[in-house]
Amino acid sequence: METTHPLVVVTAPGPGSGKMATCLSQLYHDYKRGIAAGYAKFETFPIWNLPLKHPVNLAYEAATADLNDVNMIDPFHLEAYGKTAVNYNRDVEIFPVLNAIFEKIQGTSPYQSPTDMGVNMVGNCICDDAVCCAASRMEILRRYYTACVERLRGKAGDEPVRKLELVMQQASVTPDICPAVSAALLKAETTGGPAGAMVLPDGRVVTGKTSDTLGAASALLLNALKAVGGIGDQFELISAQVLEPVCRLKTCLLYTSPSPRD
């Protein structure tokens, strides 16, 4: 690939997209043309200079439960510098291969460890550790319920759920940390249908139930707007006269779904 700038950023939508392969291929061709190019990577998580079991790093494990990523101490970094740094299994496993490729291309490898390749300074940007820990625990819980939904829909198996249950245990996460969980379950039990709940910035918990025209998520958002705006329950933000023709168009004319809520 022809490049015109001294710094080239290679990005892609997710893991396994070929970012590293593209960079190493370019590195090889640059050296063949006499260009002394280099390679570094920005990977936000896990954060190398936070503890291995810090909630932020555990949240990364939760986010990649489907990939079965595991945070670990970088053994190459520890051997080279005598210092502990957090990395993850895929980077550690592939480093000997990368090292050999660098030596073949450049004559010598510029890196002593996979952590050396990173330019991540996110850990130094944390100004309130307690807030980050709380947000990480909520994210772990969210990932757990997402995995449970994916399993219920047949899009995933038991392994991601089991992995997330282990991460929750390590991070001291239970459903009780989020008041919306118990509120949604109670609403679903009392109404006999799917329900949702949300914690507002002021701590109030708002719920939403399934009706003939609205799903739980839609009802929840409308109820949250009413709560924030100080609008009483007796008022409808969207009249049934507005919703009914939309539902009829969807189910009877366009036939996009048998249910107006889908």
Where are these regions (language model features)?
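Conserved nucleotide-sensing/catalytic segment adjacent to the nucleotide-binding pocket
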Residues: 51-91
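N-terminal leader/propeptide and maturation segments of large enzyme subunits in energy/redox metabolism
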Residues: 95-155
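Conserved small/polar residues in nucleotide/adenosyl-binding loops
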Residues: 255-260
